[in-house]
Amino acid sequence: MKFQSTLFCLCVAMLQLATLADEPKPSSRPNVIFILTDDQGWNDAHFAGHPYVKTPNLDKLAAEGTWLRQFYVASTVCSPSRCGFLTSHYPARHLIHGHFATHELNEKRHMPHWLDPKTPTLASLLKKSGYATAHIGKWHLGSGQGAPTPEAYGFDFVRHTTGNKSYWEENGEDPYFRAKSTSLFVDETIKFIRENKDGPFYVNLWTLLPHAKLNPTPEQLKEYESISPQADHPAFGPRMKKYLGNAKNLKNQSQVFYASLTDLDTQLGRLFAALEEM
C-alpha cells in the first residue's frame, strides 16, 4: 500500500467533499487515517525540538510528510476540538464550548448533551461517497442516557471509549489499561485496514494518551529510568521553564510523561510498518 503522510486542513477537505460525494472517482480517492493524540503539546516530540522525549516514528513521519507549524485553534478543550474536526464548524455553532460531562453539568453550562447526529460530518460524507469508515479510540462527543454512538455520525466500524455503549471501559480493573490502550487501538486499526485494503477507507484513530491520569507499565518506564531532566533546558521557553520549575518531582513526573509518549510512538510505528507491508 502506498503510504503518503499529509497533514491537511479539514475545512478545505470538507469543501471538497461536496463534490466528492456527488462524483466518486474510485481510482483517485485516497485512503485516510486521522490520528488524534490527546493532550500532546505541539513540541512534545523529538522532531519538534523536545530535548528528552524519544519519538522515532513520529520523527520519520514528520520528515517524510508535511509539518504545519502555524495554525489557529477555535477551542483547545477536548469535546469542542473533536466537534470541529468532525464537522469543520466552529464548536460554538453547536453550543459545544466545553468538554461533555454529566447531563447536569452540561445543562449548567448551557450545552447540549451530545453533538446533534443530524449534523453532516466528515465520516458521513465519505461514507456517502463509498468509503468504509471507522472510529477507533476516544470519542468524548456525548455520553449517558440517550447519547448516540459513533455509528450515528457515519462510522461503519466502531471501537470506542469515553462514550455511550463503549467497547472498552476504563473502570479501574486493570490499572494499566490506559498505558496499554494505544496498542489495543492500533490492533483494531490494522485489522480494519487489512479488511478494507482495496479501499477507499477512512479511519479515526483517536488515542487516550498522553492525557492524564498516566500510569505507564514498568517496561515502558525503563526507557527513562536514568533520565535527569532540567527545567531550565534552553530548548524550553519561559512559560515551560516556569511550569517545570514548579514540579513537585520533576524526574518522576517527566519519566511518566515521556514513557507514555514513547509508547504512543512505538504503537503508531506498528501501524506505519503494517501500512508499508500492504
Where does each model-flagged region fall?
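Bacterial N-terminal signal peptides
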Residues: 6-16
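Catalytic metal-binding/acid-base residues of hydrolase active sites
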Residues: 40-41, 90-91, 139-140, 208
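Active-site segment of extracytoplasmic enzymes that catalyze sulfate/phosphate-ester chemistry
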Residues: 21, 34-35, 42-131, 145, ...
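A short, compositionally biased domain-edge/stem linker segment
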Residues: 14-24
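Positively charged n-region of N-terminal signal peptides that target proteins for export
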Residues: 1-5
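Active-site-proximal cap/lid insertion segments
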Residues: 24-30, 37-53, 73-76, 99, ...
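Hydrophobic anchor at the start of a short beta-strand
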Residues: 132-133, 201
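Generic enzyme active-site microenvironment
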Residues: 36, 136
